[in-house]
Amino acid sequence: MRILEEDLKNSTYRIRIESLDDLWYLRNILSEGDEVSAITFRRVEESADVQRSRERERIPITIRLKVEKIEFQDFDNRLRILGTVIEGPEDTKGKHQSITVTVDSEISITKEWDDQHIDLLKEATDEKYVTVYTAVAMDEDEAQIFLIHPYGIQQVGTVYSGRSGKYAEGNYSEASYFDQIVNALKNYSNSIIILGPGFARDRFARYCAQRGVNVIGSFPANRTDSGAVYEFITSADGAKLLSNERIARDKEIVDEFLVAVKKDMGVYGRDQTESALQMGALSDLIITDEMFRTEDGRRSLSIAQTVGTRIHIVSVSNDPGQIVKKFGGFAGILRYRVQ
């Protein structure tokens, strides 16, 4: 994400979306009641005869919406903002309209910016926080390919070696297997991490070096699925390599919370967490991105800011966020035990 213009007097930022991950940040920055301005398209009104003979032409218009709803699925390639037009061509004012945001879109946002929204904006525009890594979790039989986004893990492919199992082939070749993996990796990031048990991982790393593939590390893991990626994230090597990644920070704080619960130093659920907040007893508030966008979430964040509690927003697109979601979307680590 890039900030193109900053108008602090009017609480407005104009930004450009530069990657799919920016759409996740934008989803969490936007709230109902915000105002956004961007170019959208509408169909030219034509007579019924003309409509039957050809598809209606779409022309670009610039509109300003008051946000009512945001539609976005994780790892999707677009975000839709729906609302009422407050500025635009005369015949559009007061009508419902949508703006579709994709990579390379430019959009202006006017809102009441609190600290968390500003932090998200800064994180989205800082390259050290938004690196996407490619992980290959593999053994002699298969390789699963994952993208490690700042907010979650996305599986994007699987390559079978044909050595054994239902995909077994009589003409198995390890070189052919490795070549298929390398070809699959061409579509993704150059920052490649190889994970897995046994020696196939190391042989593949050497093969990549011979082919000029940019492998930044080969690390042991007990599995060849997404569990291998989470195992790596929690390892010392993963913590060092991914220290700036949101997903690694999510994992670290949720692990601390789980330890705190065992020691009777953790609370969870909206009511327990807010009660501890109001007493000033929470050192850390952990809230899912889903709850961050709710009135209850905003209230808890406001209290946390007032009493000096550290705030952590975790994504439900990854395992740590799913853990917090199962605890009701709100969790906290206590400064001291409460009754």
Swiss-Prot record:
The keyword Nuclease applies. GO terms for biological process: nonfunctional rRNA decay; nuclear-transcribed mRNA catabolic process, no-go decay; nuclear-transcribed mRNA catabolic process, non-stop decay; ribosome disassembly; RNA surveillance. It is found in: Cytoplasm. GO terms for cellular component: cytoplasm. Keywords: Cytoplasm, Endonuclease, Hydrolase, Metal-binding, Nuclease. GO terms for molecular function: endonuclease activity; metal ion binding. Its EC number is 3.1.-.-. Its cofactor is a divalent metal cation. The keyword Kinase does not apply. Its main location: cytoplasm. Belongs to the eukaryotic release factor 1 family. Pelota subfamily. Monomer. NCBIfam families: pelota. The N-terminal domain has the RNA-binding Sm fold. It harbors the endoribonuclease activity. May function in recognizing stalled ribosomes, interact with stem-loop structures in stalled mRNA molecules, and effect endonucleolytic cleavage of the mRNA. May play a role in the release non-functional ribosomes and degradation of damaged mRNAs. Has endoribonuclease activity. This is Protein pelota homolog. The gene is pelA.
